[in-house]
């Protein structure tokens, strides 16, 4: 008998979002520096004897899930600060470029996996709100006979300010989601935002549910990347788009040597000084080196069923944005 699909904890911001979710067991998941937390099973449905890598260590697949979970549980409170310090703020530009590449239309339903502290989700909400407000202004200018009361009513309808767009943030790590919710409240994000505790390898959503699936700095921490990609394909609507922002392979030998020196000699030290956690940031650096190259990851996305798969390398290949469509 098949086990029920993963997790079931919903929390939400905004009126009108009360989706019924299926309950079940807590699974494990998480991402890396900059970005958002992702999947690796904490309580897998089937025990597997296969070995995998946790940074430079060789561990069982079952063990990796718990270790990755502990990493992001440990760094959650300092996650955003460390992202700025480690990347010198460049991670913000990379995420802005991801949104520019996405260019969501009004009414877009976005699933942000390993969304942790909300960087992609908040950018999405800002984008769709600004687009909708520009549309409103054009419409109001065309209706000069509206009273001031009617105009004010148009702008006070918070739910409508997003043009029907919604974002679901899915992460397995409760501490990361907690930080994200606190940021949302502090920055005034109330409508169009929902939070789900869930596993990227076994998403708690129906088929053909979302228009866009994003995952930023998370997929390399998934125990079974191929399974996470298949789940992304499953939950997207026909015509839906997969977008992944992830560390990649630097092709310039000189830049690669400098990048390695900085990654292994500086980042763990920053982790110890700022977050009091050397080991977690040592793992994050090691996990970057084990992630497939741009071309290899492109092939994995195609194997999951996506079409028109492309990628763009940023900052000499330190990161790359991969894109694919479900046809």
From Swiss-Prot:
Compartments where found: Mitochondrion inner membrane
Domain of life: Eukaryota
Alphabetically ordered keywords of this record: Membrane, Methyltransferase, Mitochondrion, Mitochondrion inner membrane, S-adenosyl-L-methionine, Transferase, Transit peptide, Ubiquinone biosynthesis
UniProt GO BP: methylation; ubiquinone biosynthetic process
Enzyme Commission number: 2.1.1.201
The reaction(s) this protein catalyses: 2-methoxy-6-(all-trans-decaprenyl)benzene-1,4-diol + S-adenosyl-L-methionine = 5-methoxy-2-methyl-3-(all-trans-decaprenyl)benzene-1,4-diol + S-adenosyl-L-homocysteine + H(+)
GO annotations of cellular component type: extrinsic component of mitochondrial inner membrane
Binding positions (S-adenosyl-L-methionine): 117, 171, 199-200
Pathway: Cofactor biosynthesis; ubiquinone biosynthesis
Record: transit peptide: 1-49
Alphabetized GO MF terms: 2-methoxy-6-polyprenyl-1,4-benzoquinol methyltransferase activity
InterPro entries membership: SAM-dependent_MTases_sf, UbiE/COQ5_MeTrFase, UbiE/COQ5_MeTrFase_CS
Membrane-protein topology: Peripheral membrane protein
Function as written in the Swiss-Prot or TrEMBL entry: Methyltransferase required for the conversion of 2-decaprenyl-6-methoxy-1,4-benzoquinol (DDMQH2) to 2-decaprenyl-3-methyl-6-methoxy-1,4-benzoquinol (DMQH2).
Family assignment from sequence similarity: Belongs to the class I-like SAM-binding methyltransferase superfamily. MenG/UbiE family.
Subunit structure, as described in the record: Component of a multi-subunit COQ enzyme complex, composed of at least COQ3, COQ4, COQ5, COQ6, COQ7 and COQ9. Interacts with PYURF; the interaction is direct, stabilizes COQ5 protein and associates PYURF with COQ enzyme complex.
Protein's recorded name: 2-methoxy-6-polyprenyl-1,4-benzoquinol methylase, mitochondrial
Organism the protein comes from: Pongo abelii (Sumatran orangutan)
Recorded name of the encoding gene: COQ5
